[in-house]
């Protein structure tokens, strides 16, 4: 069966569709669980400062396990790694349902997510190749964003009805992801027989970082995706602060709806990138990255809901068009140098470090009293300048 998968590189093959379904259910569970667990914290009268800590333990798991998850993904069949990782998520969600401390349960989900990510992206390069890889990434990103959109809404709606019911729904989503993983054919491990000593694995991760950062194309991809996802997480929190100030709306639903517009836009942008950008024309995505920052700055000046929706939809479209080709470039080049699993693990380390850094800077700005609108404008301008600098640097590297 694995042989048939290697010869059938269609993005509509059984193996590829199983990956996409598993990814949708897993991401659906991740996002529904976040809102369901936040509702649980409120119901159990945890202090407000505990809510961002919940996100931090999730992100921290990615950073802590980065030296190890890439080797795990490359040492075993990636479909089976995905299944075990979703099993960890299932255990974490089920534990929260059964009364385990929510921070402990959510940390277990974060560990599962950290192990899952290199395998889910690395397997794309084993199921398809070349320009089809960009299209496969488009499908993956589209399914992920659709799951983020639906999972967030479902988690919030179900939690308003019954918190435990929402948590059970999350566990069922993870169980469905485990079942979908069973339909992914068992492929040959990319790099079997590596050392499992912690010191050796840490050195291996460090070595992968050095190799990828020494290559102009992969360094370009790592910086671009890190900036994008760091900015994306920061924008989510910025919206919560910005809506009451700029729009005069104090409910909890409006920031969620605005975030949903970004998610819808990313689906559209990812689809456009799959059609218009190849591995040889990755630089086409860079103007979209610069425009993200420009549009964020313009968005921050709005005082009406309709233009805010439209601009966030545009931000999402630009984001999807920007990030999908960069992901594909890293997978293709990383697979040949350090293995796809190690490449994605290094990418996760960079992206999550960028998230912590940007959220830290954002929190500092809020702490010293910078107005929300000013934060948005400054954030947009700095992001546009950062992507422009990255593009200039990439063009200079390409000319050597």
From Swiss-Prot:
**Alphabetical keyword list:** Cell inner membrane, Cell membrane, Lipid transport, Membrane, Transmembrane, Transmembrane helix, Transport
Kindly list the residue ranges recorded as spanning the membrane.
19-39, 53-73, 91-111, 139-159, 164-184, 227-247, 257-277, 281-301, 304-324, 352-372, 373-393
> Which cellular compartments is it found in?
Cell inner membrane
The keyword Metal-binding is annotated on this UniProt entry: no
Membrane topology is:
Multi-pass membrane protein
- From what superkingdom does this record's organism come? Bacteria
Q: Which is a Pfam family this sequence falls into?
A: MFS_1
Alphabetical list of InterPro entries matching this protein:
LysoPLipid__transptr_LplT, MFS, MFS_trans_sf
* GO cellular component term of the entry, any: plasma membrane
SS bond partners: none
Primary site of residence: membrane
Question: Which Gene Ontology molecular function entries are recorded, alphabetically?
Answer: lysophospholipid:sodium symporter activity
Q: Which PANTHER family match?
A: MACROLIDE-EFFLUX PROTEIN, MAJOR FACILITATOR SUPERFAMILY (MFS) PROFILE DOMAIN-CONTAINING PROTEIN
Record-linked NCBIfam families: PRK11195.1
Q: Which family does it belong to?
A: Belongs to the major facilitator superfamily. LplT (TC 2.A.1.42) family.
Its function, per the record, reads: Catalyzes the facilitated diffusion of 2-acyl-glycero-3-phosphoethanolamine (2-acyl-GPE) into the cell.
- Name of the protein in question: Lysophospholipid transporter LplT
* Organism of this sequence: Salmonella gallinarum (strain 287/91 / NCTC 13346)
